[in-house]
């Protein structure tokens, strides 16, 4: 099953299109985030009704829930969004588009913190109406300083680099480099693949961000 988490404003399309792009099956859940107070409740209610009607035409056995989020306290809103994400069942799909910015910003923060719990992040473009999948960086990753030097060496290469090359450049044992690369991959900072019997390593988006946070980029 899937649980979709999405803000909703007055436009049902920003919710419906991302859901349809990922699929909808019996037992799936839709959790729509709204501010706990709003100036035009009627328009919001109409948008929620449109979502429910359109999705029920496709799959009647879908649960739709409205979650009320604090809009005037950023920290409280982040924690509320956090609870929704970690309490969701199945594959969690977070839509970072639509709705009030007062809800979207806290949801984005919570989604980045809990990226390991999210199967997919998507967004609905206000410009061209396209639904795009977003790469979710593991911003909570943490590795020892001696392993960071291996990450830096990977980043020094524009393209992929082989583990034998890293062993030579860093003047370390093959077993040490293998351990470092395995740890970095577990943290989502690099990705690897085999070319024959040789493993090649490539920096990920999360790895690039990690080095910027760490002050090494």
Which role fits each region the language model picked out?
Residues 1-91, 106, 112-217:
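Long, low-complexity, Lys/Arg-enriched
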Residues 99-104:
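The conserved phosphate-sensing helix
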Residues 91-97:
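Short glycine-rich phosphate-binding loop at a beta-alpha junction
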């Amino acid at each position: 099953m899937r649980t979709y988490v999405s803000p909703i404003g007055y436009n049902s399309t920003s919710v419906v299109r991302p859901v349809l792009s990922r699929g909808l099956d019996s037992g799936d859940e839709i959790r729509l985030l709204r501010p706990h107070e709003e100036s035009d409740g009627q328009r919001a209610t109409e948008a929620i009704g449109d979502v429910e009607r359109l999705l029920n035409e496709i799959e009647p056995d879908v649960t739709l829930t409205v979650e009320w989020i604090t809009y005037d306290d950023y920290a409280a809103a982040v924690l509320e969004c956090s609870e929704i994400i970690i309490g969701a069942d199945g594959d969690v799909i977070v839509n970072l588009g639509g709705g009030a910015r007062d809800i979207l910003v806290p949801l984005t923060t919570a989604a980045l913190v809990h990226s390991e719990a999210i199967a997919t992040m998507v967004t609905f473009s206000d410009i061209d109406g396209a639904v795009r999948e977003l790469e979710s960086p593991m911003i909570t990753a943490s590795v020892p300083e001696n392993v960071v030097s291996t990450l830096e060496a990977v980043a020094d290469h524009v393209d992929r680099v082989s583990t034998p090359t890293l062993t030579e450049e860093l003047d370390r044992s093959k077993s040490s480099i293998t351990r470092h690369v395995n740890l970095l991959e577990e943290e989502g900072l690099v990705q690897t693949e085999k070319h024959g019997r040789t493993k090649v390593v490539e920096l990920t988006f999360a790895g690039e961000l990690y080095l910027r946070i760490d002050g090494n980029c």
